[in-house]
Amino acid sequence: MESSNQENFFETDTQQAKRHLRAKKEANTFGNPLRMPSKILAVIPDPKKPQSSVLIAESGGRVSRINTETRTTTAKYTGPSVPVTCLATGGASNGVLFAGSWDKTVWSWDLATRRPLRRYDGHSDFVKAVVCGRLGDKPILVSGGADKKIIVWDADSGRKLHTLQDPTTTMMSLQHLAIDPVLSTADEIVLVSASSDPHIRRWRITLDSYSQLPVDETPSSADPAAAAAASSSGEEKLTIQEHETSVYKVLFDVMGDEVDLWTASADGTAKCLVRERAFAAEDVFEHGDFVRAIALTADWVVTGGISQQIKVWDRTSGALRAVVDAHFDEITDLVVLRDPAGRSPDVLCSVGIDCTLRTWPLDHKGLDAVVEEIRAAAEAKAEDEQEGEKKKKGEGKKEEEEEGLMTAEEEAELAALMEDDD
């Protein structure tokens, strides 16, 4: 019979260290973890209760509605038999739930009744990103896939309106989509797409047409000479390139005056791309390792990813304010739970490959308390381990000493033998 125990297979020292660290962290209860039956790949606020409820996409092939205060599953949306990767809400009264899946389709349900609605079939590979908008009186669904295509749908009829592909710069697998709330109008959506390449693209979409939106060069651009040369030659800059490799998340800061674009990348950074500077990077946050997720508040920039750590940065100074080390596998998504009436402080919700959903206070006092709790627990555990090692060494030494000692009977026999030799 073959063994599935990892310890029975060849592992590098790094792999062993990671596995041992994961085993140590697995039992922790920081963030009041809710353990789900499968990996959690995405999370969005519940539009009906954004301060206390979320929707999560699970690798087990379902979407769950979770009350973050009671830690209970209040609804299950089923149908897919493969992982669900991404979520969005839209449609009439924001009452339709959309979910992209590994089965190459987008599923939809009535958010209130859980009744399955239409499926959108048009991609030739995994669907990895979905977002909703409106064009005139029509609700619109936009999906992006591993097939390197963006598809725009009439959400009501299921009719495919457009298929977007970059004709000049190779666009890889789609990772995330966002709608620009400043440039979009009643009859036109400006879509931002991120993919498994360094290029961020913008698209102008109407019911009848679409085009790739050039990036406006300004004298304040990073390279004014290059901007002037491009302008004089008639060349258009069609992509924003501020990262070195894949961009996993794009997020507009709707709380800020300029509504700048924020990004998270596999190059280990999160960045603020400033609208008035043609989306050139201004603030850079060096998270380290792949950054899968980013969330924003008035005070903080929050990042998470493969390192398993949540890092909280001061928005004003850029300083690292806190490191929350609780998940024991990759963090896949972050979302801020915000009371629309402002009656309660913001709360961060994090989800990951470790099958857990956790929540964290984002007020200064609450955040400090969490960091101190994790630090104190780590110190106590380290002391326990040191004591255990000392005890183990002491027992080993005692055994060695005992092995070197003879019983009274053995000593008498040895003395008799020595007398016989004399």
Located regions from the model:
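Terminal intrinsically disordered, low-complexity extensions flanking WD-repeat/beta-propeller proteins
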Residues: E2-K25, S211-S231, G288-F290, T297-D299, ...
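A short helix->beta-strand "capping" segment at the edge of beta-propeller domains
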Residues: E11-I40, T70-T72, S231-E235
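Short C-terminal beta-strands that terminate individual repeats in beta-propeller domains
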Residues: F30-R35, T73-G79, P116-G122, K160-T169, ...
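Beta-strand-rich domains and repeat architectures in extracellular enzymes and scaffolds
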Residues: N32-G61
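Canonical WD40 repeat/beta-propeller blade segments in eukaryotic WD-repeat proteins
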Residues: R35-D46, S81-G90, D125-G133, T169-S184, ...
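Short coil/turn segments that connect the beta-strands within blades of beta-propeller domains
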Residues: P50-S52, A92-G95, D137-P139, D187-I189, ...
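Conserved strand-to-loop turn within each blade of WD40 beta-propeller repeats
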Residues: A57-G60, A99-D103, S143-D147, A155, ...
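WD40-repeat beta-propellers
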Residues: V63-N67, V106-W109, V130, I150-D154, ...
